[in-house]
Curated annotation (Swiss-Prot):
The gene is degQ. InterPro entries: DegQ. This is Degradation enzyme regulation protein DegQ. GO terms for biological process: positive regulation of single-species biofilm formation. Belongs to the DegQ family. Stimulates the phosphotransfer from phospho-DegS to DegU. Affects protease and levansucrose production. It holds the Pfam family DegQ.
Length: 46
């Protein structure tokens, strides 16, 4: 039972790291989209 519990803890820890990594990636994608939007807007008004 304890071994299984330890396995579950490890899996949850890895999942947490994956979620943080995914969140960081999404944040970077959003920044890129914002920059592209600003560029497109600047091109539109010039």
């Amino acid at each position: 039972m304890e071994k299984k519990l330890e396995e579950v803890k490890q899996l949850l820890f890895r999942l947490e790291l994956d979620i943080k990594e995914t969140t960081d990636s999404l944040r970077n994608i959003n920044k890129s989209i914002d920059q592209l939007d600003k560029y497109n807007y600047a091109m539109k008004i010039s």
